[in-house]
């Protein structure tokens, strides 16, 4: 990266007269931030954000440069870059599809902001079938390009092995917010950067899914690629 962005605690001000604390979750609707944020050069802003895909809307003067600013701050480590190359998909040679199930199929998070566990196997099979049909529609629209599917559900990824699409290895899948290890963290970054290097990315949405996930949106901004939604 071009900038040493890591700050020490001694670099930060905590005097209220010099700082302003900003929680992006206070700004949920599209226009609720308007008129409430006036940036001042003599203030230090401490921004706490989980839904980072909304940041360009809240700070519009940086929105058009999000991609450039990201790459000034971050670049893949040598180890991550090696893992990305080992995936075997040249950049812009595939279409990415992302599906975030959270607890809908495996129910592997005991605590989650998305309580979407499905009760019956029949309901789970129905959701899987609808997502598969959504992927086939995407494939039909992009016949001459590989479709690379990403998901937090090993069960779903195993269910599409018979389809004319591709996946990465399904080991080390997890959510880093709820317990993690080095391999799981690496898998998360592999998925993020592989999506960012696609020609474009589709996010599959459904009432049962964690459809407001910002993962694919963030990857699309990193790669400055088109982001589309497929409802199932």
Which role does the model predict for each range below?
Residues 1, 146-154, 205-206, 230-232:
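Acidic carboxylate-rich catalytic motifs and surrounding loops in phosphoryl-/glycosyl-chemistry enzymes
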Residues 94-95, 146, 200:
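Structural motif
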Residues 118-137, 187:
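Well-ordered, non-membrane alpha-helical segments in soluble/globular domains
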Residues 186-232:
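A donor-sugar binding/catalytic signature common to diverse glycosyltransferases
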């Amino acid at each position: 990266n071009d900038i040493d962005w890591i700050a020490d605690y001694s670099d930060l001000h905590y005097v209220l007269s010099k700082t302003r604390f900003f929680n992006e979750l206070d700004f949920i609707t599209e226009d609720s931030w308007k008129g409430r944020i006036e940036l001042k050069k003599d203030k230090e802003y401490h921004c706490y954000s989980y839904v980072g895909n909304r940041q360009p809307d809240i700070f519009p003067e940086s929105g058009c440069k999000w991609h450039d600013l990201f790459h000034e701050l971050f670049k893949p480590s040598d180890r991550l870059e090696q893992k990305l190359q080992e995936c075997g998909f040249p950049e812009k040679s595939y279409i990415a599809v992302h599906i975030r199930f959270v607890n809908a199929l495996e129910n592997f998070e005991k605590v989650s902001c998305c309580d979407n566990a499905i009760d019956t196997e029949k309901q789970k099979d129905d959701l899987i079938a609808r997502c598969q049909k959504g992927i086939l529609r995407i494939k039909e629209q992009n016949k001459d390009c590989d479709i690379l599917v990403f998901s937090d559900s090993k069960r779903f990824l195993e269910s599409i092995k018979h389809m004319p699409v591709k996946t990465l290895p399904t080991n080390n899948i997890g959510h880093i917010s709820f317990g993690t290890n080095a391999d799981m963290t690496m898998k998360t970054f592999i998925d993020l950067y592989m999506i960012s290097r696609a020609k474009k990315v589709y996010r599959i949405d459904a009432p049962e899914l964690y459809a407001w996930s910002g993962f694919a949106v963030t990857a699309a901004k990193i790669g400055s690629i088109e982001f589309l939604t497929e409802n199932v």
